[in-house]
From Swiss-Prot:
SUPFAM superfamilies: PH domain-like
Upper taxonomic lineage: Eukaryota, Metazoa, Chordata, Craniata, Vertebrata
Coiled coil: 159-200
Naturally occurring in which organism (per UniProt): Mus musculus
Protein name: PTB domain-containing engulfment adapter protein 1
Family the UniProt entry places it in: Belongs to the ced-6 family.
UniProt keyword list: Apoptosis, Coiled coil, Cytoplasm, Lipid transport, Phagocytosis, Phosphoprotein, Transport
CDD domains to which the protein is assigned, alphabetical: PTB_CED-6
Length: 304
């Protein structure tokens, strides 16, 4: 384990061991950001990182952006960086991965530490701005490191695996919290879309269905082009169309009226022929069909 805080041994620790081992010490600060560095420790290394992040801060400030505020939770297990209001964990720097910590002697507001990222294995330098607590925060991290190192020596390294498991569980919890936050945002977005859809399909915003106009008797006006469905007979077949009647009597191409066997003359026929004609006329009225009936109309022709 790296003894990066040996230069702070002459300092008097500010907190009780129980406060750092069983709980954590919270601090508020402004987070300037983090940047990759070449070495795991060194004053010149952090000085270059501070200069780089300060320059980036001035650019953001000129653009009207504010430096984000964060909450630091320091314990023997590491340094957590959280969003102050939501308590969402932004970074979880495990203590055994922190290799260097120092406050800036030229700027009493600035403090920094170097931590090795667990995923990329790159060394990242975190820089913070605290108006009154920069040196105190640095000492608190040093005290947490000292207590963790003593526990390591007392246990003979037996608790290293346990702490690795705890660190893995903390990482898993952090990932689940992040996933939970993303799911909440998605649910809120879907609810917002659903409300928008319901409003757009409401009667006030929908298409009004126009009912057909009616006359003063609440009846639909007659339209000569409207389709009239043919009336069906009882057996399901359609009735024959009603023949149209002309205003005038139809005539043939010679101008004569069509032949009518029942009205061809004003004379009387012999009784036998007249009875036959009456029988035929009555049969036609009753729908009689003629099939193979043998009769002669010669006397009729002689009378017409």
């Amino acid at each position: 384990m790296n003894r990066a805080f040996s230069r702070k041994k002459d300092k008097t620790w500010m907190h009780t061991p129980e406060a750092l081992s069983k709980h954590y010490i919270p601090y508020n600060a402004k987070f300037l950001g983090s940047t990759e560095v070449e070495q795991p420790k060194g004053t010149e290394v952090v000085r270059d990182a501070v200069r780089k992040l300060k320059f980036a801060r001035h650019i953001k400030k000129s653009e009207g952006q504010k430096i984000p505020k964060v909450e630091l939770q320091i314990s023997i297990y590491g340094v957590k960086i959280l969003e102050p209001k939501t308590k969402e964990v932004q970074h979880n720097c495990q203590l055994h991965r922190i290799s260097f910590c120092a406050d800036d002697k030229t700027d009493k507001r600035i403090f920094t530490f170097i931590c090795k990222d667990s995923e990329s294995n790159k060394h990242l330098c975190f820089v913070f701005d605290s108006e009154k607590c920069a040196e105190e925060i640095t000492l608190t991290i040093g005290q947490a490191f000292d207590l963790a190192y003593r526990k390591f020596l007392e246990s003979g390294g037996k608790d290293v695996e346990t702490r690795k498991q705890i660190a893995g569980m903390q990482k898993r919890i952090q990932d689940l919290e992040t996933e939970n936050m993303e799911l909440k945002n998605k649910v809120q977005d879907l609810e917002s879309r659903l409300r928008t859809t319901q409003v757009s399909t409401s009667p006030a915003h929908g298409v009004t269905v126009m009912s057909p106009s009616t006359d003063i008797f609440d009846m639909i006006p007659f339209s000569p082009i409207s389709h009239q469905s043919p009336t069906s007979a009882r057996n399901g077949t359609q009735l024959p169309p009603i023949p149209s009647r002309s205003a005038e009597t139809k005539r043939d191409l010679f101008g004569a009226e069509p032949f009518d066997p029942f009205n061809c003359g004003s004379g009387d026929f012999p009784p036998d022929i007249q009875s036959k004609l009456d029988e035929m006329q009555e049969g036609f009225k009753m729908g009689l069909t003629l099939e193979g009936t043998v009769f002669c109309l010669d006397p009729l022709d002689s009378r017409c």
